[in-house]
From Swiss-Prot:
The lineage of its organism: Eukaryota, Metazoa, Chordata, Craniata, Vertebrata. The modification N6-acetyllysine is found at K191. It is found in: Cytoplasm. One of its GO terms (molecular function) is mRNA binding. The modification Citrulline is found at R59, R140. Associated with ribosomes but is not required for canonical ribosome function and has extra-ribosomal functions. Component of the GAIT (gamma interferon-activated inhibitor of translation) complex which mediates interferon-gamma-induced transcript-selective translation inhibition in inflammation processes. Upon interferon-gamma activation and subsequent phosphorylation dissociates from the ribosome and assembles into the GAIT complex which binds to stem loop-containing GAIT elements in the 3'-UTR of diverse inflammatory mRNAs (such as ceruplasmin) and suppresses their translation. HAMAP family: Ribosomal_uL13. This is Large ribosomal subunit protein uL13. The gene is Rpl13a. Its main location: cytoplasm. Keywords: Acetylation, Citrullination, Cytoplasm, Phosphoprotein, Ribonucleoprotein, Ribosomal protein, Translation regulation, Tumor antigen. Phosphorylation at Ser-77 upon interferon-gamma treatment in macrophages involves a DAPK1-DAPK3 kinase cascade and is causing release from the ribosome, association with the GAIT complex and subsequent involvement in transcript-selective translation inhibition. Citrullinated by PADI4. The modification Phosphoserine is found at S77.
Length: 203
């Protein structure tokens, strides 16, 4: 991958810890990483167990002054960001610089809706978990511990998918019309095509 190029990852269907470990390594190597659809990230283990773990974490606070931390994030993107932070030496200059190269988002807002999104096979749930194993969605966990924007994100995602579907239909129609137009003029331009081919201008 070229230096300065942004790696856009689709978080949906990936396991939280495995994806975080790979992302942490990439940002330390100097690559810019954007993770979209963090609400679709999976966590291994059943939902109830994961919720109990997070509720136990919410009780961790500074007795004398809770505003000093630890801070408990509710948005799926921030929960994922904190997981990655735990895998980086974030109190050093190198770790801070690496963390600045990471961008996390709920849903797929512009301009990332128009960009090619990648997956990480080594972190995919379907590859890593047995089909019978239980798992939870980070979006649902976040919603049940205080994230307020689950419905908003879902609505925006539906709109984006509908828009993408329409764009794909339009693209297919244009390709079909182009093919038909080429077929219509094939006989008329065949002699010119032959000349171009003999001169090596057309392959």
């Amino acid at each position: 991958m070229a230096e300065g190029q942004v790696l856009v990852l689709d978080g949906r269907g990936h396991l939280l810890g495995r994806l975080a470990a790979i992302v942490a390594k990439q940002v330390l190597l100097g690559r810019k990483v954007v993770v979209v659809r963090c609400e679709g990230i999976n966590i291994s283990g059943n939902f109830y167990r994961n919720k109990l773990k997070y509720l136990a974490f919410l009780r961790k606070r500074m007795n004398t002054n809770p505003s000093r931390g630890p801070y408990h994030f509710r948005a799926p993107s921030r929960i994922f960001w904190r997981t990655v932070r735990g895998m980086l030496p974030h109190k050093t200059k190198r770790g801070q610089a690496a963390l600045e190269r990471l961008k996390v988002l709920d849903g797929i807002p512009p301009p990332y809706d128009k960009k090619k999104r990648m997956v990480v096979p080594a972190a995919l749930k379907v590859v890593r978990l047995k089909p019978t194993r239980k798992f939870a969605y980070l979006g649902r966990l976040a919603h049940e511990v205080g994230w307020k924007y689950q419905a908003v994100t879902a609505t925006l995602e539906e709109k984006r998918k509908e828009k993408a579907k329409m764009h794909y239909r339009k693209k297919k129609q244009i390709l079909r019309l182009r093919k038909q137009a080429e077929k219509n003029v094939e006989k008329k331009i065949c002699k010119f095509t032959e000349v171009l081919k003999t001169n090596g201008l057309l392959v």
